[in-house]
């Protein structure tokens, strides 16, 4: 692999020094979790401790004063779930953190997949009562593909739960990575009193304030050998804590930051996001151990974040974030150099130059103009059809970053307009929603069937498409479900396609790039086809064509 082209374009000393300092300040991460693990609550509490909000939005939302900070779409507010992604930037102790807030509902994981393409770190949030769940496992596999450092926050320790040792063992056995409990809990459920920081050798006892977590939690810090500790905890809790601590100190792995950054070890933190227990300690440790903005592979080799020429890629599109203006925003991850307002960049996919004249920082529904940004930052670009997901923009010599893959959907249905006179609006709406990545669109190989096939990872995704077509394009639609549950893209073995389509109740369709896709009724059908058509190589991931 080539080295970074930075040596061919030397910076002035001060400019390079400033660039190095700004990149060093950035930390970028996404939270992955199963629904109801507490992602929105943890997000808000991180913002609370980061000083971005003064009171936790979830608490105020329950009082019907406003919605949670990170939710904005009308349907989200009606349903009480996160459907879209946004970016939340805040300063903490001299660092700039970019939290790539992602949908928490299981029906919107593909948007999360794309967001993980822009993340340098992942925070895996686990419900202490439930352990690892389906959605978390799926998202973990995407993190593993990208070798992302994963920090684990085990939530809801103030409720009945599995034991800390059971939870860590499950992570090790099912995900195949070592764990290191940085903050080990003292008691669980109604006996949850605090945590012991194994790296700083300090005890942190939490005080219940009665504010339901809307304000920062107070804690009492003391040494592990403080003679007052046993009386404060009670003899039973103290003895149980000492026994478990002795066990993990003797049998557990040593903390290895290189293994963390390689995705081979996950630092584990315990707490209660609702009551703010352990949140600030987690944030402090994350700041210390998280990976800085990473280098990215490109057509020219590895591009370091400190390369002087600006570059970045679009990982998300979102229309109508402000319904009054029917706008369209492209979310761009800065990969190298310094972004400046009004700069002119090259757009390799179209061969054109584009002036980035109205860049925005996106804090949920709020926006403010951005004058400069650096690697690890995410900015919003007004996008009148100029960009699509995976686009690269850059200054200097041509840079193209790898395209963002699509993942296998699990639900399929024909989408039909109920009013033929609205077909033009219907077609426009479907096209724009596809460009956003709101849903995958497949087409039948039968030219007489012009209606698109929606391919989604959950039923609610269909509902969102229908809702937005009606609200934003004035088109009413109906769905005709198809009885398939798996999709696989054909990598090799084209000659076997006809046979696979004729046998085993399997259908061949095409994606937006006209690549063949096989739809299967179930896993059993997939295994039958794979066993019978040995020359047929299939993939659960689709890589868009390169430029």
UniProtKB/Swiss-Prot annotation:
The reply to whether Protein biosynthesis figures as a keyword in the UniProt entry is yes
The UniProt keywords, alphabetically, are: Cytoplasm, GTP-binding, Nucleotide-binding, Protein biosynthesis
Under Pfam families, the record lists: EF-G_D2 (PF22042), GTP_EFTU (PF00009), RF3_C (PF16658)
Q: Does the keyword Cell membrane apply?
A: no
**MF (Gene Ontology):** GTP binding; GTPase activity; translation release factor activity, codon nonspecific; translation release factor activity, codon specific
User: Where, by residue number, does GTP bind?
Assistant: 33-40, 101-105, 155-158
Pinpoint the tr-type G domain residues: 24-294
Q: Which GO terms describe its cellular component?
A: cytosol
Q: Where in the cell is it found?
A: Cytoplasm
Name a biological process GO annotation.
Answer: translational termination
Q: Which domain of life is it from?
A: Bacteria
Q: What does this protein do?
A: Increases the formation of ribosomal termination complexes and stimulates activities of RF-1 and RF-2. It binds guanine nucleotides and has strong preference for UGA stop codons. It may interact directly with the ribosome. The stimulation of RF-1 and RF-2 is significantly reduced by GTP and GDP, but not by GMP.
NCBIfam families per record: prfC, PRK00741.1, small_GTP
The record's PANTHER family line, in alphabetical order, gives: PEPTIDE CHAIN RELEASE FACTOR RF3
The family classification in the record reads: Belongs to the TRAFAC class translation factor GTPase superfamily. Classic translation factor GTPase family. PrfC subfamily.
Q: What is this protein called?
A: Peptide chain release factor 3
**What is the organism of origin for this protein?**
Synechocystis sp. (strain ATCC 27184 / PCC 6803 / Kazusa)
Q: Gene name, please?
A: prfC
